[in-house]
Amino acid sequence: MRKSLFLLVGAFCLALAAKATPKYIFLFIGDGMGMGHVMATETYNRLVLNNDENILMMQFPVASMAMTYSANSPVTDSAAAGTALATGHKTKNSMIGMTPDSVAVNSIATELKAQGYGVGLVTAVAYDDATPAAFYAHQTNRGMYEEINADGAKCGFNFLGGAGTHVAEKSKEKAEQIFDNYRANGFTVVNGLDELNKANAGEKVLFTSNTAVTPNEIGYTIDSISGALTLQQLTTACLDHLKKVSPDKFFMMVEGGNIDHAAHGNDGGAVVKEVHNFNKCIRVAYDFYLQHPEETLIIITADHDTGGMTVGVSNGPKNITLKEMDCQKISKEQFNDFCSRNGDFTWEQMKEAMSEKLGFWTRIGINQEEEARMKESFDHMKAHDDRTQKTLYKEYWSFTAIVFDILNHKYGIGFTTTSHTGNPVPVFAIGEGSEQFKDLNNNIEIPQKIRKLTNLD
């Protein structure tokens, strides 16, 4: 009798252990996506799109936060934060896949691959950018792109995808040599969805976009670039590939990299449209979860907060609706490039362009003081003595910075910096084992909990 009872208890425990092991794991990382970015998007979703339901991530049953400090700073960079989320180890800013004393540490993706999981990583920026690189590379500096790609070629993952490689920003010839190395290590290298669909791809794919604005950017959602690859399409392509080559179990990381780029530029409208698009990518995984609810885990978080974005500003609109946001038809980056291309514009021509692209004077009221401020800076820009606003990814005319400062103020959106902050970031989860993420997390705990759930620890 006692023996039978022990056997029954043992069988029950084994059943619980088996049930607690997710087979399909999705980790979504909104680069730079603080709670302010999420709430601005939720406000837009509710007041402009008139949706009664919250954005999908905010519907998940687990909602928590994570601290993001690095080993050497209260304010992390993407390399240290990516390493924390990938490996469960704190490191110094700029370091990839290593401890502060330069000891290489494996990511959960590498460990899961060794246990037979398929692995896919996709991003809206370069596939060798800091966050995705932290899952496969081990380098002392995030800018060591050739070395990062050497690690990538040997990682054995099933899908790496993004806008392109940072190496191509300096040398297309070196980029081709890097692609050849991936091919030599068994990857099928494709440029665009058409090539992917036509290729008889093997188990490993390196995907780059043939419509990318730069090798580090597929393009902003707000710019509505005709025919441009979207992160939602890339997420679907990666998922389809994993279902084909590793149908029994896989791990997938999706990074919304353009959220960070837009936030560095303090482009409130672009941030909201990027987070809204990121939510569509989450929907791809959620639809899969609905088919496999007892086997799937979805986690959503961010590597850090960029910009310190807020809904509400000093002396801003008393009744924030964000309805003006749909007047914005161009990102701050593209508007800046537009200004550079049209240096011969008169002020009246620029006013007409701002009316068309931003809604100024037509749908968004501009007072005399605001117009005078913009015109003064516009005149300096035409005379080439305009000061510039420098951020991590872009250098803007002061005129552009002033225009978008006024635009954000009209929205009721504020920013505290063009850099990162030390603010905690949101954590949302649903599915098998999601309850593990319900308490306040340190970012290193997220991969540690995935290890525990998959019996890697």
Regions picked out by a protein language model, each given a short descriptive name:
Residues 1-4, 282:
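Positively charged n-region of N-terminal signal peptides that target proteins for export
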Residues 3-4, 73, 96-103, 136:
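Short coil/turn segments at secondary-structure boundaries
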Residues 10-19:
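Hydrophobic h-region of N-terminal signal peptides that target proteins for export
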Residues 12, 126, 164:
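Residues that line or immediately flank small-molecule/substrate-binding pockets and catalytic motifs
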Residues 23-40, 85, 90-91, 99, ...:
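Mobile, glycine-rich extracellular loop/lid and propeptide segments
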Residues 23-24, 33-39, 43-83, 129-133, ...:
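A post-motif C-terminal structural segment
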Residues 92-94, 263:
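Glycine/charged-rich beta-loop-alpha catalytic/anionic-binding loops adjacent to active sites
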Residues 97, 105, 119-124, 191-194, ...:
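Surface-exposed patches in mature extracellular/periplasmic domains of secreted proteins
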